Amino acid sequence: MINFPTGMYEWSMLASQLTAEKTIRFQRFLRRFRLAYCFDGMKLHFLDQNTIDGYDALFSVFLSYSSYELLLSSISTYYDDASIKEDRTKYSILNPGIAERLKRDAKLEEFLHLEDKNHPLTQQVDRFFNSNDADILPLLEAIKDKVKHGFFSIGGMKPDSKEHSKDIWDGSRELLVMTEDIFHNFVLCES
């Protein structure tokens, strides 16, 4: 089906056997995935195009990452295993090109800096910017957290270039592909 993740037929067979609580969680994921998949930017007036591109990239990450989180939470509920939604270390998005370009963006690094140095996400973001690690998933999570907690101000982060906004946008699209793969593999295993 268009703009739904691969595996919808298998999902419909599986859903007919689930409790309402478990089905509702997956339905939330499917609606968020569809929104993230269909998101093509915002229509904003009186702002320059670089600012609009930055907002579009940040909001795309928010939608894609929250879709990913909803899927992990749904699978966690399905198996009655809370560790599934908490253990995100088994997934990664390796993209050396995007990683290398974004590591050069000092404004992005400053924007993503968290006050709590002991927070696991702070350590992941620091590791991303200070190593050869090409996994952009922790970076996307940090962006999602900043948007979610009200730091949704492109003025505070304004990417160094249009290319960086595009890289952030492309990272969010890669996250959607990974999320779709996780969903598809899940329904294939369970149906």
How would you describe each model-predicted region?
Residues M1-L58:
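Charged alpha-helical initiation segments
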Residues A134-V147, I154-S191:
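Amphipathic, Lys/Arg-enriched alpha-helical patches that create a basic surface
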Residues E69, F151-F152:
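Short, flexible loop/turn elements at secondary-structure junctions
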Residues L30-A36, D53-Y78, L176:
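Short, hydrophobic, well-ordered secondary-structure elements
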Residues G41-D48, S76, F152-P159:
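Short, flexible helix-adjacent loops and helix caps
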Residues Y79-D135, A142-I143, G150:
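Flexible secondary-structure boundary motifs
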Residues L72, V147-K148:
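Hydrophobic side chains within alpha-helical segments
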Residues Q17, E21-I24, Q49-L63, Y68, ...:
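Conserved aromatic-histidine-acidic binding/catalytic patches
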